[in-house]
A protein has these predicted regions:
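SDR active-site strand-loop-helix element
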Residues: 9, 34, 59-63, 100-105, ...
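N-terminal Rossmann NAD(P)H-binding glycine-rich loop of SDR-like oxidoreductase domains
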Residues: 4-24
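NAD(P)-dependent short-chain dehydrogenase/reductase
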Residues: 138-185, 190-192, 198-199, 227
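Mid/C-terminal beta-alpha module of Rossmann-like enzyme folds, strongest
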Residues: 14, 196, 203-227
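NAD(P)H-binding glycine-rich loop region in Rossmannoid oxidoreductase-like domains
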Residues: 44-81
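Catalytic helix-loop patch of NAD(P)-dependent Rossmann-fold dehydrogenases
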Residues: 80, 84-88, 108-150, 154-155
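Rossmann-fold cofactor-recognition segment
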Residues: 32-45
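NAD(P)-cofactor binding segment of oxidoreductase domains
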Residues: 73-101
């Protein structure tokens, strides 16, 4: 009975919930789904103890400070969650000779290029959110060699650069907001990403940086080829 043990943090977020649903179809792993109530990933000791006690093999970090517009006012909290915490998770994964899947964002780029970004493009964040997520990627890769960073164009690419402004404007008209989200099919999108993560879990984590976006996965082909 030595099933691989998978820890999914941020389990009550959009991606975490999709991971939970898909876990039903992937019974060959044992799962631990946590949110801040079960495990505060900003507490290094708590992370180390949890991972050791439950003998975790792979950590999938779906937890992040994602309120892009509020990040500028909450720099410290944002940095803790997006930069420091992934380092703790990576350290814990390494202590078990395990792997980390760190979910990141295309906000590590400034959004001025209109072509899809490639993995080898040099990051150039122009927001607190983007800077902290980039620092989190670097910290994770530094602390654990078996780290797979998946950058996703969350909802950001769907709306272009004015996502936040659009949301604030639409916030006044709730019905409109509902329609917009329905049209985009946000959950499907999160589900696609969750499915991609399960492909990695099933086939074995290949360390490095990968881009995943709604156009499909630029380097997923290379990733599966590498296995």
């Amino acid at each position: 009975q030595n099933m691989k043990k998978i820890l999914v943090t941020g389990a009550n977020g959009q991606l975490g919930n999709e991971m939970r649903l898909l876990a039903e179809e992937h019974r060959n792993f044992e799962y631990f789904f946590t949110d801040v109530a079960e495990l505060d990933i900003c507490d290094e000791q708590a992370v180390m103890e949890f991972v050791s006690a439950h003998q975790i093999d792979v950590i999938v970090n779906c937890a992040a400070y994602t309120a892009v517009d509020k990040a500028e006012d909450n720099v410290e909290l944002c940095d803790k969650l997006n930069h420091v915490a992934p380092g703790y998770l990576a350290k814990a994964a390494r202590s078990r000779n395990g792997c980390l899947v760190q979910v990141s964002t295309d906000y590590v780029f400034d959004g001025t290029a209109h072509i899809p970004y490639k993995e080898e493009d040099t990051p150039c964040p122009n927001s607190v959110y983007g800077s902290t997520k980039l620092a989190g990627e670097q910290e994770a890769l530094k602390q654990c060699p078996n780290t797979m960073v998946i950058r996703t164009a969350w909802l950001y690419s769907t709306f272009g650069n004015n996502f936040v402004k659009t949301m604030i404007r639409l916030g006044q008209e709730k019905e409109t907001l509902g329609v917009i989200f329905d049209q985009i099919g946000t959950p499907t999108y999160a589900r696609d990403l969750a499915q991609a993560i399960f492909v990695a879990l099933e086939k074995g984590i290949v360390p490095g940086i990968y881009h995943f976006s709604n156009e499909g996965v630029c380097s997923w082909y290379d990733f599966t080829k590498a296995i």
